């Protein structure tokens, strides 16, 4: 967050870059507002865009594009997002409720930045690192959707199931199309040069596209 106030760093970006990616400001744990979510009349999540807006506004003022990073990442979601009444001490919500929350969250985030800063956020990493390695996935699943990360359960998998990735892309594509925006949608991961992981990502991409979604 402090890089937003580092004049030397910002001057470097203006001189040498045409696109920036937020380290933290656009991740769910920076955007989701627990108190507002608990008080929402429709039960859907609410956001606080203040930190992210500062970064995107600076990019807009200086003619830089922004890569949105990231909408869905099991490693950086606030735990209470998955629980009844947005309270981590209460039971996990049902698949139906979690899908509603996921759709609302993705729709709100993409819409906010496109309407407030038209054309600045030119793409989104919709889902990050969903393909597991080693024993972190069901071996019968050719997509190798992550069930755990370093021994910790993937709560998206626990609440929605292995198709949470496809639904995330579906909701993102529907939002972009409704806005009439030129925003590209990406799946992001690491170690993609390993054959096993590469093949799983290819299988996942095909599954996403079979959901009538064009993942770039």
What are these regions (language model features)?
Residues 2-15, 102-112, 197-208:
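Short, acidic/polar
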Residues 186, 191-216:
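Substrate-binding cleft/loops of secretory-pathway carbohydrate-active enzymes
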Residues 1-2, 55:
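Short N-terminal signal/transit or membrane-insertion segments
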Residues 15-36, 41-192:
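Substrate-binding cleft and catalytic face of glycoside hydrolase catalytic domains
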